[in-house]
Regions:
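Active-site clefts of carbohydrate-active enzymes
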Residues: 1-10
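Soluble non-cytosolic domains of exported or imported proteins
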Residues: 12-13, 88
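Catalytic and substrate-binding clefts that recognize carbohydrates or anionic sugar/phosphate headgroups
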Residues: 16
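Active-site phosphate/pyrophosphate- and oxyanion-stabilizing loops and adjacent acidic/basic residues
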Residues: 19-20
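Carbohydrate-interacting/catalytic domains
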Residues: 24-31, 37-169
Length: 169
């Protein structure tokens, strides 16, 4: 299959949204090398298996020799070194999501309850374990979702709630 960033049209906002879905949904998340920095590539397989883009240097810092296949043209910005230095990079976002998942049992092994909203562009679900409840809201649209309503059934979210933004706290 093609690399995620190529499927998403090289759109970093969409890649961030896809990462949020992947790392908050149930199951074992799988990342193909370079996905966390936005590497691109489409079939045939050789174009997906290009060298890891470590730096903006020649051959993306992968080798001082001549690689059997050239690195992708976006290696000057989509590389580990450049994104390590940028707090708002795709790599930093992946790291934040991975830390969030590792720090919260509900995201690792908790149950999943899909919630309904009156806005089809807002994906809402609850991840819950014996020790915590995490409400996940993901805006699937480029435009802000400022006005929407959630339908919550009695249960894990009943009573007084004190919401906390775990990702940007």
């Amino acid at each position: 299959q093609n690399r995620v960033m190529s499927v998403l049209g090289d759109d970093t906002a969409k890649a961030r949204m896809a990462a949020a879905v992947l790392l908050t949904a149930p199951g074992v998340p799988f990342l193909y090398y370079g996905e966390e920095i936005g590497m691109i590539g489409t079939k045939p397989d050789e174009q997906i298996r290009t060298p890891m883009q470590w730096t903006a240097a020649e051959n993306a810092g992968f080798s001082t020799g001549k690689p059997w296949i050239a690195v992708k043209p976006n290696y000057d910005t989509s590389n580990v070194e450049t994104q390590n230095a940028a707090a708002a990079s795709l790599l930093s976002y992946y790291r934040s999501l991975i830390h969030l998942r590792n720090d919260h049992e509900a995201l690792r092994v908790g149950d999943y309850t899909q919630l309904s909203t009156d806005n089809s562009r807002v994906y809402a679900f609850l991840r819950h374990s014996a020790h915590e409840n995490i409400l996940v809201l993901i805006n699937l649209d480029a435009a802000p979702a400022a006005d929407y309503k959630l339908s919550l059934t009695p249960g894990a979210l009943s009573g007084t709630l004190n919401p906390v933004d775990l990702l940007t706290k």
